[in-house]
Amino acid sequence: MHQGSRITAVGHYQPARILTNEDLAGMVDTSDEWIRSRVGIRTRRIAGPDEPVDELAGHAAAKALASAGLTPADVDLVVVATSTAIDRSPNTAARVAARLGIPGPAALDLNVVCAGFTHALATADHAVRAGSASRALVVGADKMSEVVDWTDRTTCVLVGDGAGAAVVEACAPGEEPGIGPVLWGSVPEMGNAVRIEGTPPRFAQEGQSVYRWATTRLPAIARQACERSGLEPADLAAVVLHQANLRIVEPLAAKIGAVNAVVARDVVESGNTSAASIPLALSKLAERGEITTGDPALLFGFGGNLSYAGQVVRCP
């Protein structure tokens, strides 16, 4: 048993292809002004047909491991949050473990769509605390370009592809936990408000319902997540929300009240990458030096199933 765990490194990966608003204007009835005014997105990255989601995840995971100074043999748990897995089995976590050469890990996928990474992080934290794992690799990865209808201007303008990863390790004796208690839940009666359904599977949502829920119900829940770590929103150095769209991120962040925090706005450049959005944004903040080791950051995912999960972490 351990008193707690912490994130020791992060990493991210995005495909090379950039799809601009102008590109989309040549595909559907839209414009750069229309997209920016409604969702605040300028560009997004799109993976090619030869770039499966486990490849995106593998690249991000490898970067996180390298940043932590670890080898694949040091990992005994792989948790991947994704809703765009290639197959039901083998799962994405097993595919990532195989790509990286991780010997004999527990490997599991979690499908909680846009709230997936914070659920996965809590799962890894619990496993390390219980002594069931010593080092965990937690990945959020999605290839949303495969599940969007590219003729539907209300959804195709939103999505992007990518992956982000974190290494989770046990705290040293006497060290304060670096991952706070998770606050999670769902609104199952509204689960159809965000969905990936049909054959082939397609992403759809009730945009106004999601907006109202996110901007009216979630601020209080996010503040409660801070309270569980013994902090006030004003104590936060960073707020990393699921990057749904800028018109949700900005009012939600403002209502949380983290007046001293940098607010991740990676959605402007990356679009909505579902489970990848939080670790992708966190890794970029670290890469740019906008957060430093030990800074308290609120990670808060929300979306499909109308699920949510949030926790305060200490930045690596």
Swiss-Prot record:
Example of a GO biological process term: fatty acid biosynthetic process
Q: What class of enzyme is it?
A: transferase
Annotated region ACP-binding: the residues are 243-247
Question: Mind naming one GO cellular-component term on file for this protein?
Answer: cytoplasm
**Keywords associated with the record:** Acyltransferase, Cytoplasm, Fatty acid biosynthesis, Fatty acid metabolism, Lipid biosynthesis, Lipid metabolism, Multifunctional enzyme, Transferase
Which SUPFAM superfamilies did the record assign? Thiolase-like
EC number(s): the record gives 2.3.1.180
Report TM segments. none
Active site positions, chain numbering? C114, H242, N272
What does the record give under GO molecular function? 3-oxoacyl-[acyl-carrier-protein] synthase activity; beta-ketoacyl-acyl-carrier-protein synthase III activity
Q: Subcellular localization, per the record? A: Cytoplasm
Q: Is the keyword Repeat assigned to this protein?
A: no
Coiled-coil stretches: none
Stored CDD domains: KAS_III
Q: Which reaction does it catalyse?
A: malonyl-[ACP] + acetyl-CoA + H(+) = 3-oxobutanoyl-[ACP] + CO2 + CoA
Keyword Ubl conjugation listed? The answer is: no
Identify the metabolic or biological route this protein is part of.
Lipid metabolism; fatty acid biosynthesis
Q: What NCBIfam families does UniProt report for this protein, alphabetically? A: fabH, PRK09352.1
Q: Which family does it belong to?
A: Belongs to the thiolase-like superfamily. FabH family.
Any notes on this protein's domains?
A: The last Arg residue of the ACP-binding site is essential for the weak association between ACP/AcpP and FabH.
Q: How does it assemble?
A: Homodimer.
| Function recorded in the entry | Catalyzes the condensation reaction of fatty acid synthesis by the addition to an acyl acceptor of two carbons from malonyl-ACP. Catalyzes the first condensation reaction which initiates fatty acid synthesis and may therefore play a role in governing the total rate of fatty acid production. Possesses both acetoacetyl-ACP synthase and acetyl transacylase activities. Its substrate specificity determines the biosynthesis of branched-chain and/or straight-chain of fatty acids.
- HAMAP family reported in the protein's UniProt record: FabH
Per its record, how is this protein called by name?
A: Beta-ketoacyl-[acyl-carrier-protein] synthase III 4
Q: What is the lineage of its organism?
A: Bacteria, Bacillati, Actinomycetota, Actinomycetes, Kitasatosporales
